[in-house]
Amino acid sequence: MNIEVKMEKEKSLGNQALIRGLRLLDILSNYPNGCPLAKLAELANLNKSTAHRLLQGLQNEGYVKPANAAGSYRLTIKCLSIGQKVLSSMNIIHVASPYLEQLNLKLGETINFSKREDDHAIMIYKLEPTNGMLKTRAYIGQYLKLYCSAMGKIFLAYEKKVDYLSHYWQSHQREIKKLTRYTITELDDIKLELETIRQTAYAMDREENELGVTCIACPIFDSFGQVEYAISVSMSIYRLNKFGTDAFLQEIRKTAEQISLELGYENI
């Protein structure tokens, strides 16, 4: 067997195992109190040994656990957590998208919308520029670094934990590096930057990810005053210099405030 055929066979087996595992999760979702292994195997059209092996893998990853009845399995709260994250993202996009579309039409630039996800931001919505001037490399589902993206800086600036920044900086030393000559990589420098962001309520990526591209971001507050989402507009440095920061910031801030109001924030 040549190496190409072997690799293709391994890939096929991996896909097959993934599909079978997902099928087991789907079946278990209909049995909140648990389902016996024999019945699971029957419903999934698998032999018991294969079903048991897949369930062990799912259990190791925290998606299933033994039920009260001997030989039965049930889903864990981890599955619910994933579903809630998806639902949360879908709900916020439903709320925010009309305002983001209006901003896109007014400014003509790339509109980005992200959610805080632990030590990263994740792009959950994006609108391409209507002026055709600049298309960025960012995409929906992309994880954004906190230290060098405008929206990431927003999340760092409004982080409630006092010691979070120091912990983040220490634990991400391999990740924190110069992407361009403008990227901030010193802790003292980012502290000054974040203080300015808190005072002005907006953040900028000044060619810190990509030369020639800049970004302006504003926080979105929920009813508890937490910043779980952020909005940003990307443009060429040429257009920023031509029209000035204020020409863009006013509309971005207005949009962020509108979405914040929709989320129940009243301190505007």
From Swiss-Prot:
Origin species: Haemophilus influenzae (strain ATCC 51907 / DSM 11121 / KW20 / Rd)
Q: Which residues bind DNA?
A: 37-56
Q: Does the keyword Transcription regulation apply?
A: yes
Is DNA-binding included in the keywords of this UniProt record?
yes
Instruction: Name the Gene Ontology molecular function terms of this record.
Output: DNA binding; DNA-binding transcription factor activity
The protein's name: Uncharacterized HTH-type transcriptional regulator HI_1032
Q: Which intervals hold domain IclR-ED? A: 92-265
Alphabetized InterPro entries for the sequence: GAF-like_dom_sf, HTH_MetabolicPath_Reg, Tscrpt_reg_IclR_C, Tscrpt_reg_IclR_N, WH-like_DNA-bd_sf, WH_DNA-bd_sf
